[in-house]
Amino acid sequence: MARVEQFGLAIEQDLYDFLVSEALPGTGVEPEAFFQHFSSLVHELAPKNRALLAKRDAFQAQLDNWYKQNGAPSDLAAYEAFLRDIGYLLPEGPDFSVTTSNVDAEIASIAGPQLVVPVMNARYALNAANARWGSLYDALYGTDAISEADGAEKGRGYNPKRGEKVIAWARAFLDQSVPLAGGRWADVAGLALTDGYLDVTLASGDKTGLMDPSQLAGTFSEDGSVTSYLLRRNGLHVEICIDAKGAIGAADKANINDIRMESAITAIMDCEDSVAAVDAEDKILAYSNWLGLMKGDLEEVVTKGDHVFTRTLNPDLEFTDPQGKPFTVASRSLMLIRNVGHLMTNPAILDRDGAEVPEGIMDAMVTAVIALHDIGPNGRRKNSRRGSMYVVKPKMHGPEEVAFAVEIFTRVEQALGMEPNTIKMGIMDEERRTTVNLKECIRAAKDRVVFINTGFLDRTGDEIHTSMEAGPMIRKGDMKQAAWIAAYENWNVDIGLQCGLSGHAQIGKGMWAMPDLMAAMLEQKIAHPKAGANTAWVPSPTAATLHATHYHQVDVAGVQAGLKSRTRAKLSDILSVPVASRPNWTPEEIQRELDNNAQGILGYVVRWIDQGIGCSKVPDINNVGLMEDRATLRISAQHMANWLHHGVVTEAQVIETLKRMAAIVDQQNAGDSAYRPMAADFDTSIAFQAALDLVLKGREQPNGYTEPVLHRRRLELKATAIPAKV
């Protein structure tokens, strides 16, 4: 591919053309100025980037040596002293409160679900942006949230018995969320607006209204009749849709045709763990979809059966408040974008020495200039009404790396003419050195931080790699019961509240990774708002609608107020290493652990390498579909590498397991015409060789990250064959 030289940068022609012809026009930023500033940014900050990565390696070497001499720490005080001596654990400064300004309500004050989607997939991105609202009826009917017992099977057509169960569940939810002064929602026979109040007629003929009349936010009318009532609890809206001729409403005594939930309040458009972006071609796709979202013109032609339609961004909703004043309600999730971390470089742009530029610097500059289509001088202000750009920054290790990200953002703002602190930062608390120094990490970004989030998956991967030499780790399924996990989750909330995030920023919790198990999610994920999290990750718009019910049941602001006075989680618990003290696993248990890890690795890696798919639903050993991305891959690969290193398993056993499970993964993908079987020839299957690398060379991967192997192997495939098209 030809390259264009600009101020010492060698930019692949297609990327250059995209920037000059599509991204920059309309932003007020001229190409010459853009590339001049971009070059300065790269050549001045790339050396700092490399130095920070070298520091990671130096810490790891010191930790490896300590563990080799001492094993798993039994004297946690001595271990903590060692971490302080080497500068891994830093002194904690005085208390402070964050000062982030111009933060949209979706982040500052509204508690609710958050989606994370691969920005390279336009359909997923549009679905996520439009997932601000979802049908509660559809979410219940189409999932296992409603049992199929007693004749309530989903079936091919509409099942009235199942519909009755859905309606009963939804009415019971309304009793909790927007209770009536008298009677139950199941007995409602009619709704009307009278003198600014919701007038409710029960089947008995009695009249009632809302227990709290202020929960009526507004109405929408067509042809003089109210067709929807907008209610509100804990800052979240629920819309009761009336249609006497509707498929459901016609048979409903109150003509309620649907109940629509305000669902995914925010959505992260991901350039990182859920995508496979290894070169200019891939980055252009990511950036062009982000451009379409910021300009509002992204669209995707969707085919469902015989029905073909074009999906676009939903327009805002119009209502009239009880006093007769019109107002607008957002119909799209507030979009954040996750840039990559500090580790990777990308061949799309080379510096003056011919080296690949740090991908995190490239992401910052390009995604920010694209955001000007929304927040710039001539911006639409359809995403951020407060004029802010929201960047989630992953995989940072400690406050020095957070400060470096702040420096990048500051330089980008100066280059693009943005006001200082326009670019807000979400800090992923997913690396051990960030966890133990979280207060100082937040301090480093106190004018920008809008989000801290525990990422159990990556955090576990880092836990394993950090203490690789300490001994064999406990089984992967036992990790959630380990002492460090509960302390880590509570510590994140405690530190966030101590730093004044409540009412200003999100304190988030991690992903529900089983998209088919919605009944279990409804039962369990309420623990996140109860723990003080004002957002948590969900795997689909449907899951967002169901998880939204939890934020009606739990007043997160009240929970956070109560948690501010609790004793902070113990650092010593966080520092405890999850090594199996006296492993007594049977050979069958060991093999099952290997099988499960291998299946997850192969099922994900084969689609990443061969098809460029960065996020997949992969069946586990029990045939439960699990959402897999690079974070889950990191855990599985590091866990296998750890057991191999400590002799729990042999290399021959690992290879045999991977080969046997590859055949099973091949069978599971037999219906995919784009799939390339691995077991046909293990030696020539680049995907299988990548899986081998991730495990057999797992100890030498930087911090246990999977990106170096994945990128190298994906580029190898793209160079030697025409990649499979999805």
Swiss-Prot record:
Its EC number is 2.3.3.9. Mg(2+) binds at E430, D458. It is found in: Cytoplasm. Keywords: Cytoplasm, Glyoxylate bypass, Magnesium, Metal-binding, Oxidation, Transferase, Tricarboxylic acid cycle. Acetyl-CoA binds at V116, R123, Y124, S274, R311, P539. GO terms for molecular function: magnesium ion binding; malate synthase activity. Disulfide bonds: none annotated. It is an enzyme of class 2 (transferase). Its cofactor is Mg(2+). NCBIfam families: malate_syn_G (TIGR01345), PRK02999.1 (NF002825). Belongs to the malate synthase family. GlcB subfamily. This is Malate synthase G.
